[in-house]
């Protein structure tokens, strides 16, 4: 018998099995194709707005995704650099093939993991708890816990024009049949979602004189806190072009053969990542849409056409592509397509990702209604950790909304009504000023170490960094600069420099003051800093904390206020039917979602402030 069985080796499954194995659990990873581990079936990229923050949080908790993209990335950029630090988001283009090879190698080299190439079509359940996984042959593999990371494979159906056929993730991969029906027989409620992917083109057929080059950052920052530098990495360029009105007219000619508009697609698609035909239908007044041409690897001619996701007929796809500047003679390697698949409404999971209906069964990734590699990987990591902790009879590991984007993600899943593929945005995180990509290790490394996924070396490295930040902050608070030095530091600034000596910490709160300039201006300050550290990441943390100090203090007060509600647990057996004073909608939503705390209950749509007041009185202040 295995401790933990993981079904599916996509981004959720990989992080789940690695997290569990690294905590000492005996694990089995079951996947239908061992050559497709961590396959990037859609865009060949990791990170982006909010997703980059999640990737660095995964790294801080001992996950693998950040290391994988550092090793296999072909272009690195920091998005939103012109905005405040809370909005900075790392993103990298990946070598799609190498990413999969890297992740398989890591899994094969990890102790405590066995691999089986097969498919899970059912669960062995006894007395309300999972006991193992059932394969198509009828064989039952016993396990103390099972984590389902099914991606888009559950009854997957691919659409290209009016043609549709079974498919699991790509056109060449079969779907998983039987598992949805097995879960429904156990009491789970399933829904249907849709996602899509654009065509791939031959990069040799692009006219580069008509497209705009988009290069990587000259001094790229690694995703992983354990990668020293990416300076040696040769980067490739992406390219930008636009659709035009002719493109839109050609696409409209295919609407009569569109599975999206004909009603053949029943699943709900992602609102914030619409297909190109949906964009021109919903925004008819917009004359053009940006198209990004992204290489799929350093050693392939295949190119991903970002912004052109479509399920229109192949002939329309090619005609429309060839109307775009730079693509007049383009060759299409693979058509775009839409895929429908089953998911399970996530009000049926706890914030540990264990299901409420079947004990020791965990859901992670698109089975919970999310989209995106990063969101899936984060769930896999948390499911793997919590499955391991439960087997060890240890306290569950739950991140709240003030601690991590991962906490926001999972809290949204268990409290909100998911009716379309969920993706993370910075706007989803009310504590985003504190949840930056640059401080993920400071926020989460200790928790990962306590959970067993972060080794002692990584933990001590982070603790040393935290100590250096405290010492440097103390130095900035105690050391002062004289007016003549301040005048030099503020040369050209709109504000008048102070006439009295001022603490460096107060000076650094001013937006025009640069830390590096102060090192040049004051030998004493430079000497004091060098005694503490030469790590630019430490400098960055001190400066950000000083410049955002007022905002961070307000955020802390809000966190403390919310924590008071989170401290009120709601028993799992609590019946809302007998509570007088609840609104009908509130009673219905609370019964459906079964929140674990009053704080969680307060975030369920349809539960009013007066409903929360009633609960506080009933459960006890």
UniProtKB/Swiss-Prot annotation:
GO terms for molecular function: flavin adenine dinucleotide binding. PROSITE patterns: GIDA_1, GIDA_2. The keyword NAD applies. FAD binds at residues 8-13. NAD(+) binds at residues 269-283. It is found in: Cytoplasm. GO terms for biological process: tRNA methylation; tRNA wobble uridine modification. It comes from the Bacteria. GO terms for cellular component: cytosol. Pfam families: GIDA, GIDA_C_1st, SAM_GIDA_C. The keyword Cytoplasm applies. Gene3D superfamilies: FAD/NAD(P)-binding domain, GidA associated domain, C-terminal subdomain, tRNA uridine 5-carboxymethylaminomethyl modification enzyme MnmG/GidA. Keywords: Cytoplasm, FAD, Flavoprotein, NAD, tRNA processing. Its cofactor is FAD. Its main location: cytoplasm. Homodimer. Heterotetramer of two MnmE and two MnmG subunits. NAD-binding protein involved in the addition of a carboxymethylaminomethyl (cmnm) group at the wobble position (U34) of certain tRNAs, forming tRNA-cmnm(5)s(2)U34. PANTHER family: GLUCOSE INHIBITED DIVISION PROTEIN A, PROTEIN MTO1 HOMOLOG, MITOCHONDRIAL. Belongs to the MnmG family. This is tRNA uridine 5-carboxymethylaminomethyl modification enzyme MnmG. It comes from Chlorobium phaeobacteroides (strain DSM 266 / SMG 266 / 2430). The gene is mnmG.
């Amino acid at each position: 018998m295995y401790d933990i069985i993981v079904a599916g080796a996509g981004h959720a499954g990989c992080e789940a099995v690695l997290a569990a194995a690294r905590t000492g659990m005996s694990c089995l990873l079951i996947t239908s194709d061992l050559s497709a581990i961590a396959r990037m079936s859609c865009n060949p990229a990791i990170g982006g707005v909010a997703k980059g923050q999640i990737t660095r949080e995964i790294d801080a908790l001992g996950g693998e995704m950040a290391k994988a993209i550092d090793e296999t990335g072909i272009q690195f950029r920091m998005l939103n650099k012109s905005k405040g630090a809370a909005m900075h988001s790392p993103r990298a283009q990946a070598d799609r093939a190498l990413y999969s090879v890297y992740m398989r190698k890591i899994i094969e080299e990890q102790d405590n993991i066995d691999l089986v190439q097969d498919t899970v079509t059912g669960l062995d359940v006894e007395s309300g708890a999972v006991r193992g996984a059932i394969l198509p042959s009828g064989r039952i593999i016993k396990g103390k816990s099972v984590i389902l990371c099914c991606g888009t494979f559950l009854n997957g159906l691919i659409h290209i024009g009016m043609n549709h056929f079974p498919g699991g993730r790509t056109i060449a991969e079969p779907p998983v049949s039987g598992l949805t029906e097995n879960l429904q027989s156990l009491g789970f409620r399933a829904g249907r979602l849709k996602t899509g992917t654009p065509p791939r083109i031959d990069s040799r057929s692009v006219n580069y004189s008509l497209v705009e080059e988009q290069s990587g950052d000259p001094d790229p920052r690694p995703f992983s806190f354990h990668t020293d530098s990416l300076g040696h990495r040769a980067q490739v360029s992406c390219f930008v072009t636009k659709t035009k009105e002719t493109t839109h007219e050609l696409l409209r000619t295919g609407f009569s053969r569109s599975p999206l508009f004909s009603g053949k697609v029943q699943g709900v698609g992602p609102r914030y990542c619409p297909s190109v035909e949906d964009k021109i239908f919903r925004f008819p007044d917009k004359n053009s849409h940006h198209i990004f041409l992204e290489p799929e690897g350093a050693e392939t001619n295949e190119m991903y056409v970002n912004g052109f996701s479509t399920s229109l007929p192949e002939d329309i796809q090619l005609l429309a592509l060839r109307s775009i500047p730079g693509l007049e003679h383009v060759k299409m390697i693979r058509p775009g397509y839409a895929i429908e698949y089953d998911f399970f409404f996530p009000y049926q999971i706890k914030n540990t990702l264990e299901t409420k209906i079947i004990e020791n069964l965990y859901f992670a990734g698109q089975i919970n209604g999310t989209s995106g590699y990063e969101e899936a990987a984060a769930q896999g990591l948390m499911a793997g950790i919590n499955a391991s902790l439960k087997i060890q009879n240890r306290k569950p590991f739950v991140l709240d909304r003030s601690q991590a984007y991962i906490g926001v993600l999972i809290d949204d899943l268990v409290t909100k009504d998911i009716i379309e593929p969920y993706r993370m945005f910075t706007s989803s995180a009310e504590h985003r000023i504190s949840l930056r990509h640059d401080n993920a290790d400071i926020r989460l490394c200790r928790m990962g170490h306590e959970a067993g996924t972060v080794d002692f070396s990584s933990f001590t490295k982070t603790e040393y960094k935290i100590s250096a930040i405290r010492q440097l902050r103390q130095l900035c608070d105690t050391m002062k600069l004289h007016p003549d030095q301040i005048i030099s530091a503020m040369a050209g600034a709109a504000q008048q420099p102070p006439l009295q000596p001022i603490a460096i910490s107060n000076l650094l709160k001013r937006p025009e003051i640069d830390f590096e300039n102060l090192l040049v201006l004051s030998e004493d300050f430079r000497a004091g800093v060098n005694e503490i550290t030469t790590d630019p990441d430490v400098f960055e943390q001190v400066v950000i904390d000083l410049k955002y100090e007022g905002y961070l203090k307000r955020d802390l007060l809000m966190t403390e206020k919310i924590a008071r509600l989170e401290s009120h647990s709601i028993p799992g057996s609590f019946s809302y039917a007998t509570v007088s004073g609840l609104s009908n909608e509130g009673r219905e939503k609370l019964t459906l979602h079964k929140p674990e705390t009053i704080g969680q209950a307060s975030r369920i749509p349809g539960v009013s402030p007066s409903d929360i007041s009633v609960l506080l009185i009933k459960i006890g202040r």
